[in-house]
């Protein structure tokens, strides 16, 4: 009986939330440059959700980007996950870096025909959260995004600007 009580108390202590834990949710306008020298410029929206403990967090990052080069409707979707390291300081300017991996989907349509492909995706980059209000920050961010399919990698750049809600 004594062991059962100690077990219940021990498990209960792990369930108590720590004040250092937080959640960040962001929504941003994103400029996505798909490819290298003959690249396609896409505009879209990206969002992320990060679960943080002090300086370390796990982030999920999702994006939708669109362009219509030469009448072809081109859409890129990204869904990435990975670690985010944040330097938290009292000046309300918190830089971060992240390394993410996941997948992407490219789809193109023209004149009633369409095609799509899925590929492995990864991203490395960072940004800075600039505090505006107690729980709201402005987030400029730049990432290198690689889309890997059939032994080739398409090099992409994503530049974003949005708002973050710190919960």
Go through each PLM region and give its residues.
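Cleavable N-terminal export/targeting peptides
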Residues: 1-22
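Transmembrane beta-strand segments of Gram-negative outer membrane beta-barrel proteins
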Residues: 21-33, 95-99
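Extracytoplasmic loops and strand-loop junctions of Gram-negative outer membrane beta-barrel proteins
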Residues: 30-33, 108-110, 146
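Surface-exposed strand-loop-strand hairpins of Gram-negative outer-membrane beta-barrel proteins
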Residues: 32-47, 117-119
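A short acidic/glycine-rich loop-to-helix N-cap element
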Residues: 40, 149-154
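Gram-negative (and chloroplast) outer-membrane scaffold detector with strong preference
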Residues: 47-113, 119-125, 130-132, 136-140, ...
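Low-complexity, intrinsically disordered Gly/Pro/Thr-rich segments
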Residues: 142-149
């Amino acid at each position: 009986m004594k062991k059962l009580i100690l077990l219940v108390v021990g498990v209960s202590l792990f369930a108590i939330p720590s004040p250092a834990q937080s959640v960040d949710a962001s929504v941003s306008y994103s400029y996505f440059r798909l490819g290298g020298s003959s690249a396609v410029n896409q505009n879209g929206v990206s969002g992320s959700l990060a679960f943080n403990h002090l300086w370390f967090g796990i982030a999920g990052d999702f994006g939708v980007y669109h362009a219509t080069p030469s009448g072809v409707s081109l859409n890129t979707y990204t869904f990435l996950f990975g670690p985010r390291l944040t330097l938290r300081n009292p000046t309300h300017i918190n830089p971060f870096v992240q390394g993410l991996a996941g997948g992407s989907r490219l789809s193109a349509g023209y004149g009633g025909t369409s095609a799509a492909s899925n590929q492995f995706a990864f991203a490395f980059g960072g940004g800075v959260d600039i505090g505006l209000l107690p729980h709201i920050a402005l987030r400029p961010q730049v990432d290198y995004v690689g889309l890997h399919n059939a032994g080739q990698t398409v090099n992409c750049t994503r530049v974003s600007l949005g708002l973050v809600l710190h919960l």
